[in-house]
């Protein structure tokens, strides 16, 4: 898997914005990716040093629209903690209030 295939998109919520003060950044990642692959992908794409990676797997929730039943997509979320001497991720810098 390529680095750009592993990181799908950033998570921009109030909670993830509060974590940025602790140098933690949140991403939705490929479900098959492990912590080592996520760490390498973030370091390659953003040019930062990663200290730790926390991952969470979310199952899809059952949803219904009239008589049609389905599920929301399952996904994996990763919180990436940067080392104290590493620079921040530029994409998130403009979002901080």
From Swiss-Prot:
Q: Describe its assembly.
A: Part of the 50S ribosomal subunit. Contacts protein L29, and trigger factor when it is bound to the ribosome.
Task: Tell me, in a sentence or two, what this protein's role is.
Answer: One of the early assembly proteins it binds 23S rRNA. One of the proteins that surrounds the polypeptide exit tunnel on the outside of the ribosome. Forms the main docking site for trigger factor binding to the ribosome.
Name used for this protein in its record: Large ribosomal subunit protein uL23
Taxonomic lineage is: Bacteria, Bacillati, Bacillota, Clostridia, Thermoanaerobacterales
Identify the GO cellular component terms for this protein.
ribonucleoprotein complex; ribosome
Q: Which UniProt keywords apply?
A: Ribonucleoprotein, Ribosomal protein, RNA-binding, rRNA-binding
The UniProt entry's GO biological process terms, in alphabetical order, are: translation
Answer whether the UniProt record assigns the keyword Amino-acid biosynthesis to this protein: no
In Gene Ontology terms, what is one molecular function of this protein? rRNA binding
Q: Which InterPro entries match?
A: Nucleotide-bd_a/b_plait_sf, Ribosomal_uL23-like, Ribosomal_uL23/eL15/eS24_sf, Ribosomal_uL23_CS
Q: Has UniProt tagged this entry with the keyword Cell membrane? A: no
Name the SUPFAM superfamilies for this protein: Ribosomal proteins S24e, L23 and L15e
UniProt record similarity statement: Belongs to the universal ribosomal protein uL23 family.
Q: Which residues form the signal peptide?
A: none
